């Protein structure tokens, strides 16, 4: 694999993330009947560039009591993992075509928990630590349902490769037979990426701004980039799993356009939800998962396991 392939994946991701921050501020602005950023460049289009310059030219301060190595490693690890998770995504062709792409993505997203934990612990601040513990509890809790939902969808798909989902959904989106799974998946992705209404890690009133409270300038920007890269990545995964775009090898551009539009709509839904809903209480968040989602997803997983076995003897319908 050549360096150019990696760069042609990473640079567009970072650009998309930069402009997603602008889109979010604009969308939230218009939803609150104001303009949003509109000073830097035409219609505020150069705002992300100005932000990047400002953040990366500031001095990266760190608390005297912090653990230096971990404090610096955490944001680097967060961004590295966020970018690594894009490797097996078929858009329509993945960077590396893995047999167990889904498993790889789950493993990477589990590793991301460590960056949160380290940043909270290494900051040596009580607020950062509480925020980190909340974030870790939330992330690993919702990963359980994400994994089970993924398994159910892949049982319908019949293969662990993500590219196979494109073939599976040639005639019908998987959201139609699996809509309860899709709804739970979407809510779980919101919780997994620490977005409103599940942004308890950064409850301003009680925790200042969560696990990254002690970070400034560059390292803070890395956390920010990682968070938004994860948001786009989750929406891309939702598109692949439930809204499969039609892919013809003769016109791959059509797939890309189709795929991008769906991902953008889902990302806008994320922002819309942020503008509309108040934050959950922590016990409600955990009740929703362990008492509602987990039993439901387990039941649906059993259903999806038994479905191919039940229908195995039926002659093909097409």
Curated annotation (Swiss-Prot):
One of its GO terms (cellular component) is respiratory chain complex I. Its EC number is 7.1.1.2. InterPro entries: NADH_UbQ_OxRdtase_su1/FPO, NADH_UbQ_OxRdtase_su1_CS. The chain crosses the membrane at residues 2-22, 69-89, 100-120, 146-166, 171-191, 223-243, 253-273, 294-314. It is found in: Mitochondrion inner membrane. PROSITE patterns: COMPLEX1_ND1_1, COMPLEX1_ND1_2. Keywords: Electron transport, Membrane, Mitochondrion, Mitochondrion inner membrane, NAD, Respiratory chain, Translocase, Transmembrane, Transmembrane helix, Transport, Ubiquinone. It is an enzyme of class 7 (translocase). The keyword Mitochondrion applies. It is a multi-pass membrane protein. GO terms for molecular function: NADH dehydrogenase (ubiquinone) activity. GO terms for biological process: aerobic respiration; mitochondrial electron transport, NADH to ubiquinone; mitochondrial respiratory chain complex I assembly. The keyword DNA-binding does not apply. It catalyses: a ubiquinone + NADH + 5 H(+)(in) = a ubiquinol + NAD(+) + 4 H(+)(out). It holds the Pfam family NADHdh. HAMAP family: NDH1_NuoH (MF_01350). Core subunit of respiratory chain NADH dehydrogenase (Complex I) which is composed of 45 different subunits. Belongs to the complex I subunit 1 family. PANTHER family: NADH DEHYDROGENASE SUBUNIT 1, NADH-UBIQUINONE OXIDOREDUCTASE CHAIN 1. Core subunit of the mitochondrial membrane respiratory chain NADH dehydrogenase (Complex I) which catalyzes electron transfer from NADH through the respiratory chain, using ubiquinone as an electron acceptor. Essential for the catalytic activity and assembly of complex I. This is NADH-ubiquinone oxidoreductase chain 1. It comes from Felis catus.
